[in-house]
């Protein structure tokens, strides 16, 4: 689990670690009592190649959309850079991605092999930070890559989640 958001947030959120003299430390079941939507959380130390972010949740019964943003802080004025915005649009079954740098949105990417989300069903999104790109997995299947548009990965230190979903776990 080295490099995961859970590990980096464990101390900040007061998560206990279990250990015994015969085994290495084990991450306790993580419970975030404040996983309400909209959600805004800090990524300790920012991102770097090798770091992963896990988002688990359940899509609402009649969803329109939801989005996951990794941002460079949570400033509204001036607006923080958005390193990646993942937006699930249920009406046209699109999983869109884009970035906003210095106040300007880039070109939106939309091609996917299939739409992975189903109303009233659980999902698991993993965002793997690699040197040139983010690699996005949904329910264990790689769905697409998104090449970095923000130069300083360590500046990407905030996760924001909003829309028609319930969060069950972040890691």
Swiss-Prot record:
Domain annotation Galectin: ranges: 38-170
InterPro entries: ConA-like_dom_sf, Galectin-like, Galectin_CRD
Superkingdom of the source species: Eukaryota
A Pfam cross-reference name: Gal-bind_lectin
GO molecular-function term, one example from the UniProt record: carbohydrate binding
Key words of the record: Lectin
PANTHER family linked: GALECTIN, GALECTIN-RELATED PROTEIN
Biological role: Does not bind lactose, and may not bind carbohydrates.
Protein name (database record): Galectin-related protein B
Highest classification ranks of the organism: Eukaryota, Metazoa, Chordata, Craniata, Vertebrata
């Amino acid at each position: 689990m080295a490099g995961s958001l859970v590990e980096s947030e464990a101390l900040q959120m007061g998560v206990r670690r279990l250990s015994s003299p015969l085994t290495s430390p084990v991450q306790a079941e993580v419970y975030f009592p404040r996983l309400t939507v909209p959600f805004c959380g800090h990524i300790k130390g920012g991102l770097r190649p090798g770091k992963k972010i896990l988002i688990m949740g359940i899509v609402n019964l009649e969803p329109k959309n939801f989005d996951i943003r990794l941002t460079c802080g949570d400033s509204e004025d001036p607006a923080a850079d958005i390193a990646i915005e993942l937006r699930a649009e249920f009406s046209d079954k699109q999983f869109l991605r884009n970035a906003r740098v210095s106040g300007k949105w880039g070109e939106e990417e939309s091609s996917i092999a299939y739409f992975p989300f189903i109303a009233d069903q659980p999902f698991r999104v993993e965002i793997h930070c690699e040197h040139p790109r983010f690699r996005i997995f949904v329910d264990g299947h790689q769905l697409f890559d998104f090449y970095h548009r923000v130069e300083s990965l360590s500046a990407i230190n905030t996760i924001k989640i909003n829309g028609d979903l319930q969060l069950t776990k972040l890691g």
